[in-house]
Amino acid sequence: PKNSEEQKITEMVYNIFRILLYHAIKYEWGGWRVWVDTLSIAHSKVTYEAHKEYLAKMYEEYQRQEEENIKKGKKGNVSTISGLSSQTTGAKGGMEIREIEDLSQSQSPESETDYPVSTDTRDLLMATKVSDDVLGSAERPGGGVHVEVHDLLVDIKAERVEATEVKLDDMDLSPETLVTGENGALVEVESLLDNVYSAAVEKLQNSVHGSVGIIKKNEEKDGGPLITLADEKDEPSTNSTSFLFDKIPSQEEKLLPDLSISHISIPNVQDTQMHLGVNDDLGLLAHMTGGVDITSTSSIIEDKEFKIHTNSVGMSSIFERELASLFKGLEYAEMTATTPETEFFCSKTVPNVDAGSIISVTERFVDGKEAGKEIRKIQTTTTTQAVQGRSVTQQDRDLRVDLGFRGMPMTEEQRRQFSPGPRTNMFRIPEFKWSPMHQRLLTDLLFALETDVHVWRSHSTKSVMDFVNSNENIIFVHNTIHLISQMVDNIIIACGGILPLLSAATSPTGSKTELENIEVTQGMSAETAVTFLSRLMAMVDVLVFASSLNFSEIEAEKNMSSGGLMRQCLRLVCCVAVRNCLECRQRQRERVNKTSLISSKAQDALQGVTASAATKTPLENVPGNLSPIKDPDRLLQDVDINRLRAVVFRDVDDSKQAQFLALAVVYFISVLMVSKYRDILEPQRETARSGSQAGRNIRQEINSPTSTETPAVFPENIKDKETPTPVEDIQLESSIPHTDSGIGEEQMPNILNGTDLETSTGPDAMSELLSTLSSEVKKSQESLTESPSEILK
């Protein structure tokens, strides 16, 4: 809402939603589905609007970048996407990287105007030009050598923009690769094929006829001597394997005339001009390293037709090995270039690779007579686009591009830089997110449902159980339990999750700082999550623990396994109990920090009130809900203990489900006791020596097979443990009708199945004592291992 009028309309719409949802939950069988559908529709609507807003912002940024490029006056004749931003002014033997930009698709490529290029090369994506622009001299009249590498175009679909990254990395002028001969040069080809799946192998065997062609550009020139990549001095030409790079004419009709062309101008001293055109639609990852000796005579290369040939036996086997091993390794093939006397060919099909792979071309230029080195990292981006796509310029930035390795995530900034323009991403609804609309709808609906429950509680003659178990309210109870089950686990996750909360509660220094480190997920703040948690817990107290409804029908409707609803309720109870434990520990710390000399109960109570007012936990800020923490010194509050009992004893039948719930409760209490009795056994590790002595006593008593006495270290703890047990039972028995869970006196015979309350607490006390014993033994053994060094101190 942008103004007060829209705010009023928004409130009216929310009120209508609340009325309709409340009516569906209270009066209609299956009304819970109305809430689920409303939630899903609202969720998809919110996320779709956010997606459209993101696309609009991205398009605005794209237009702004284009306007900035136009204002800068940067114009080029070649359609390109270039991330090259660094220009160097080099002397002899240096390199210069020129940016050639794209401003219009209608402009003719530079290679077609400056050099006689055949018309079947219109599908070039990238051209690399070697010239001598550094020297600032006039245009040399010498002809050029044009080398084109054509790859097979795969799966070009309309309205699809697939980005391909070309990374020219680590241009190294290392003297180790120099050839001492005057006409010698070393060309090293490094090929790395990555992210190619097994489908590529099948396509290679079945339907791939693509090949790479190295052809002439100067067609009007007469045939001349050919450059062979076989060094006669070092290696005989008989070992060379023919490697003919050819292209398929039938594929050229599918090629796009407006694909981007990127030119990288690298100066050289001689009149040699070499154009490498790499058609990288397939995304083959290849590293080409070329060395040209500047002393070679220009008469060999001027106005002649040249073809590059290979001398590597391993070149033809690289592709088989790479495909067989899913292209996991690097294969190197060396090609040496010498005098142009012989001609031989070698053909190899290029695998039909997924277009998401990447071509990386690295060129090393070695100057045989210059000792200087210059290393440049060039990172470029080329884009394969559909017919409706447009060529986009990306200037003045060095892109750190993702080389297609799926383990290398890109940051949002890098993704924006990498994006050539507004992409038409398919919209997908996220799994779950607490949008403000969702929270508002849930708040209003819970308020309406809680109003009914509050009316039940405040009734003068009927108890809560009478309302819950009456036939006229069965639809309400059924749908509300569905509603609670739908969101309880998401609320628990939003509160931090049970395991992170237990970790914070059982750590020696557990405090709110650890809770603050728990990542807020799903778009809901921790305060809001705790508020919803307490409200759902209050509803569960009434509708689940105080009802005799069989949940098998609800579980069948939700496709849950048997007992799944009670397990959800147990998770909810445990989450609330752990948060109460953390709140108690926080209050104790604040009380100890503020004053350690106050012993009066009245002053302690006053201090507790001050601490609670200072903390202002979200649970206490819930309207109409008092804090469940009555005694901060206790491990579990009365309400938490009653809820755990209600989970265990709700089902009268002794089934595996009931045993599972009881075992889970025992484990949960055992874990929580670590947080309680660690503070007692190890206050601040002040008496390490006495602790080690106690550990020896424990070990002697445990190892003694005839020992029937209680170890000497336990009387205090057992007294501390056992003395409050009857008091706790009395408190529990007296507080059961008045707990917040809504469990009344009428419910207790059903819950306990006719058994006495004290008899039911016996196993709990015994298991608690056994867990205390085991934890003390463990801690004493730890202190025993630490005792020698501390005794020496």
Curated annotation (Swiss-Prot):
Q: Known InterPro entries for this protein?
A: NBEA/BDCP_DUF4704
Key words of the record: Cytoplasm, Membrane
Record membrane topology: Peripheral membrane protein
Extract the ranges annotated as region (Disordered).
Answer: 68-92, 685-793
Q: Where is the composition biased (Polar residues)?
A: 77-90, 689-710, 750-762, 782-793
Please describe the organ and tissue distribution of this protein's expression.
Forebrain and cerebellum.
Q: Which GO terms describe its cellular component?
A: cytoplasm; membrane
Highest rank taxon of the organism? Eukaryota
Family annotation (Pfam families): DUF4704
Main location (coarse class): cytoplasm
The record's subcellular location field reads: Cytoplasm; Membrane
Per UniProt, subunit arrangement is: Interacts with RII subunit of PKA.
Quote the function comment for this protein.
Binds to type II regulatory subunits of protein kinase A and anchors/targets them to the membrane. May anchor the kinase to cytoskeletal and/or organelle-associated proteins.
**Family to which this protein belongs:** Belongs to the WD repeat neurobeachin family.
Protein's recorded name = Neurobeachin
What gene is it encoded by? NBEA
